[in-house]
Structures are given as C-alpha cells and as structure tokens.
Amino acid sequence: MDIKFFDDPLEQPRPREDVRIRQIGLFLYPDLRRLAFGIELTPFRERPSIEVNITNGEGKPAGSLHVIETMTPNFSLTMHLRDDTIANPYVLTVVLYYSWPEDRERIEVERREVSFDVAQPGELLFKFDA
C-alpha cells in the first residue's frame, strides 16, 4: 500500500541542505519603532533555526531575533528597533541554519540580506527563488 501525504512533489518536505527561504515580509507599524517580521520557508524534514539581525545606517545593531528549531515553515514575529532616532538605511540579515548534532558547529544553509528604509508605515515583501 502506498500512502501519499503530499500531492505536489514541490511541496514535499526537503532534507536540511535543500531548505530555502521563499520570502521575507516586513510590516512597519505606525510608531516606526516596531516591525512585524514574517518568513516563509520551503517545507522541511528537520526543524531549522533562524537568526535575524538588523543593523542601522551607521552599521550598529538595531534589533535581533532568534528562532530555535521552528515547527512551521510560515510565521511572523514582532521586532523592536533599538535606535533612539531613525538611522536609514537599515539592513536585515536572515540566516537559516541547523545547530545539531551538538558535537558539530552550526551548519548554515542560507543567508539573505535586504535593505529597507524606516520612513512610513507599511509593508515590504522580498521574494526569492526556492
């Protein structure tokens, strides 16, 4: 008996070396101090971790976020910008990685960098080939 859980072969869970970032979404709140960070990954067999860092126009850290072994390929979280005053342009760096087995160093699968300005509330969407 052959049971198929996935109809679309492109949507089948992938091994860790084939997991990719499909898109990153940012929604800047009206206070210009918070942003919703959203990400969509390809389906995965093993749960990846994600590191997100934001640096300001002066190259200083403006925010960070770590997701350890996510269970879902699509989610969003709110980040807070640390800057007292806006320092455009900001650079968002997202690293998709695996941190186990524990006796090995972190295995980086993909890294994406996007630049954006904090000027007005709204949504930004960055799509990638996966």
Where are these regions (language model features)?
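Low-complexity, Pro/Ser/Thr- and charge-rich linker/hinge segments at domain boundaries
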Residues: 116-130
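Short, compositionally biased P/S/T/A/G/V-rich stretches that sit at domain boundaries
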Residues: 1-31, 129
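Short acidic/polar inter-strand loop motif in beta-rich domains
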Residues: 96-112
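Aromatic sugar-binding surface patches on proteins
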Residues: 71-80
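Extended low-complexity, serine/threonine- and proline-enriched intrinsically disordered segments
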Residues: 48-63
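Contiguous beta-strand segments within globular domains
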Residues: 23-45
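Extracellular Ig-like/FN3 beta-sandwich strand-entry sites
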Residues: 47, 87-93
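Short, surface-exposed loop/turn segments at beta-strand-coil junctions that are enriched for proline
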Residues: 82-88, 99
